[in-house]
A protein has these predicted regions:
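Conserved aromatic anchor
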Residues: 214-227
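Short acidic/polar inter-strand loop motif in beta-rich domains
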Residues: 175-178, 274-279
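Extracellular and select intracellular beta-sandwich modules with Ser/Thr-enriched
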Residues: 184, 279-285
Length: 714
């Protein structure tokens, strides 16, 4: 029985890993309506292509896979040119193989002859392939039907097999008829010329549907069938007329459907889809009844979805948090794991996940950490979840990251206090956590015995060569607090005042700069290295912004960066005669809120107030982070709850996912992030729960070593 179980589990993991990386999909759907951000169009002369601020239009009524496609609307003039590049949305692209096919679907809706179709090229950064005529690869050509175009990569000249494909370029071909053409493009991907072709005869299995106010969580049970490529989700409001709403890759077992209305019954069914897009028999139909939620139920719903990011995105071998749901390599994040532990403790307390499940996961984590590579007990930020070895590009980068280690230890200390039963499993977990905690030699991250600043990294090959001092009103606070609290390798308590509260900013090599006033600068050297110059930056600012007096922090920095120190450490317990941290967090939240009010007219026609801006620099001034606004709930509950309801009820169709709110968005550029960040996903349930019950704050502050720290700091 056990052998069968492990064989099936290994098989499932192998096909999930394959699906995560393979096939490579260049375009499936646009996350935003109207235009596709990851495209770039241009024309000249008497040619033309329809675009919106340089981006291809998105069509939501014509698609091959739900819910949209890209529209190519063009005129090929006799003295002009047009082209449109569609880019990968990430930095990886697709590394071509000799047996790969470039496959995409086209739908020709106008009177367009086969010879009037565009040409294509593939881009690999600056390298551009030879031009290929699409007409040469069309079979059974017809209008108003989806056609599959399959082009062997070996037939495309000037491709570099060692460089990833970054874009496909549709462009004006040899035909210059001067007529207007309209066609739609969907599902651009690279597949091997041979794919699993087992017929999907068994009907799909829909496990459950769970209704919330405006979203429905749909969960399925995937069979061990290698020819399944996607799960296709259908929705109906009358249990008769079903429409497809989404497809999901097999690396997911859940889809969250953000529905148009609440207080409505929705009916769902699913089908498996193979590599040729043939569908299996439908699953049974399940019903979800949405209803308007009160505040408490809405907060529960938000917390549950964000916590699911950590419960689902767990690396199998180590139990640690894996860095991407769509990458099969076993890279895990040390900091993300620490934040994930906090979120999952909330999940257990709220009965979203079983206590035993998290206990077993934590036991796996501490076993893995006990064998993983460390430097003076501290961990690198990225580890291989299979081997426990660092993931870096060169010997200098194979180093311990003290801030990532601090966030991991913070999570483990909370777990040590949560799993407090006198049972063998829980006592063994506490002992293992204590061993890891005591093993971190924080002193090794201070350059010399007379120094006060923690340095963010240390490498056995390069010592502090690529390391920088940390400090200031930001996420580094928890590293200083834990370093002072350590029962085995504590740094001086004075590091709080003379390290954390005296942040240093790198200026450059000290040579040639010695005339700079020593009152404003500090020369920091390391044995065998040239001295470097740092400026002392102010910690206390005592300034007024938008009528709010702010003692510390910066309105130039990300709000979420300044929220991180207080995920587990209750700011009310950090005694400092010069600053009340809880009040300062409240004031900082109000400053960001009022700054957004000052510019709210930009978006008043489409939504309520959007805040906070990600940053004040030109690159991020129009980007917003939903998590940062919601995470102010312990300090400014009224405006935080307003923000949560706005992002969910008014903008949920754009921002809500299986894992809660998206990372960032920019309406000016019609962009939303398709990636997730553990800080952004974790800070929402953690700070909501801290405001509601104080759970994480209470668990962390009751730790004996943290209690001793608080006494020291008084």
């Amino acid at each position: 029985m056990n052998k069968i179980y492990f064989f099936l589990l290994a098989f499932l993991l192998s096909i999930q890993a394959e699906a995560s990386n393979y096939p490579e999909v260049l375009f499936e759907n646009s996350l935003m309506p109207k235009s596709y951000y990851y495209s770039q169009s241009s024309f000249q002369g008497n040619s033309w292509i329809n675009h919106m601020n340089g981006h291809l239009p998105v069509a939501d009524s014509v698609f091959f896979t739900p819910g949209n496609s890209l529209m190519l609307n063009y005129i090929s003039g006799n003295s002009g040119e047009w082209q449109s590049a569609i880019h990968y949305s990430d930095d990886y692209g697709h590394l071509p193989k000799n047996n790969d096919l470039l496959i995409f679907k086209i739908f020709v809706s106008s009177a367009t002859a086969k010879a009037e179709l565009p040409s294509i090229q593939l881009a690999q950064g600056e390298n551009i392939s030879e031009e290929i005529k699409v007409e040469a690869f069309v079979k059974n050509y017809q209008d108003n039907a989806w056609l599959s175009i399959e082009i062997p990569l070996k037939d495309i000249g000037n491709l570099d097999n060692q460089a990833p494909i970054s874009s496909i370029i549709f462009k004006q071909g040899a035909n210059r008829d001067g007529k207007e053409h309209r066609l739609f493009i969907d599902q651009i991907e690279f597949l091997p010329n041979k794919t699993p072709d087992m017929k999907l005869t068994g009907k799909a299995v829909l496990s459950s549907v769970e209704a919330h106010e405006r979203h429905v969580d749909i969960v399925w049970q995937l069979p061990l069938t290698p020819s399944i490529r996607y799960i296709k989700i259908y929705r109906s409001e009358d249990n008769r007329n079903f429409s497809p709403v989404a497809v999901r890759p097999i690396s997911f077992n859940k889809y969250t459907d953000f529905v148009p209305r609440t207080n409505v019954s929705y009916y769902y069914k699913i089908a498996w889809v193979d590599y040729r897009y043939r569908e299996s028999p439908f699953s049974d139909v399940k019903t979800a009844e949405t209803k308007l939620a009160n505040d408490d139920d809405l907060l529960n719903s938000i917390e549950k979805s964000h916590i699911a990011y950590f419960t689902n995105e767990t690396e199998f071998n180590s139990g640690m948090h894996k860095i991407s749901p769509l990458v099969s390599e076993a890279s895990v994040s040390v900091k993300g794991t620490g934040i994930g532990i906090l979120a999952q403790v909330i999940g257990v307390e709220r009965k979203f996940i079983p206590r035993q499940l998290l206990l077993d996961r934590l036991k796996k984590i501490v076993r893995f950490l006990g064998k993983a590579t460390t430097y003076h007990g501290a961990f690198p930020e990225l580890l291989d979840g299979r081997s426990g070895k660092p993931i870096m590009t060169d010997s200098c980068e194979i180093a311990a990251n003290i801030e990532s280690t601090a966030y991991l230890m913070q999570g483990l200390l909370v777990a040590r206090n949560y799993f407090d039963k006198e049972e063998s499993d829980e006592s063994e977990l506490r002992e293992a956590i204590t061993s890891l905690w005591k093993n971190v030699d924080w002193k090794k991250f201070v350059k010399d015995e007379s120094g006060y600043h923690l340095y963010n990294a240390w490498s056995p090959a390069c010592s502090y060569t690529r390391s920088s001092p940390i400090g200031g009103y930001n996420s580094s606070l928890i590293a200083y607090l834990l370093a002072i609290a350590s029962p085995s390798h504590a740094i001086s308590q004075e590091s709080y005042n003379f390290g954390f509260k005296q942040p240093l900013k790198y200026i450059g090599p000290a040579i040639g700069r010695l005339s700079t006033s020593l009152n404003d600068t500090l020369i920091v050297g390391d044995s065998g290295q040239k001295p470097e110059l740092y400026s002392r930056e102010p910690f206390m600012i005592d300034s007024t912004y938008y009528g709010v007096r702010l003692m510390a922090g910066s309105v130039q920095n990300s709000l979420i960066e300044q929220q991180q120190p207080f995920l587990a450490f209750n700011p009310k317990n950090l005694v400092d005669s010069s600053i009340n941290y809880f009040d300062n967090q409240r004031d900082l939240s109000n400053v960001y809120y009022r700054a957004a009010l000052d510019r709210s007219e930009q978006f008043v026609s489409i939504t309520n107030l959007l805040w906070p801006y990600v940053g004040r620099d030109s690159a991020s001034v129009n980007r917003f982070n939903p998590s940062a606004a919601i995470a102010t709930y312990p300090y400014t509950p009224t405006i935080a709850l307003e923000a949560l309801k706005n992002y969910y009820r008014n903008l949920g169709n754009l921002l809500w996912t299986e894992y809660g709110f998206r990372d960032e968005f920019n309406f000016k550029d019609n962009w939303v992030s398709g990636k997730f960040d553990p800080v952004h996903q974790g800070i929402v349930p953690i700070m909501l729960e801290n405001a509601r019950t104080g759970l994480i704050w209470n668990l962390f502050m009751k730790d004996p070593d943290i209690k001793s720290l608080v006494d020291k700091m008084k």
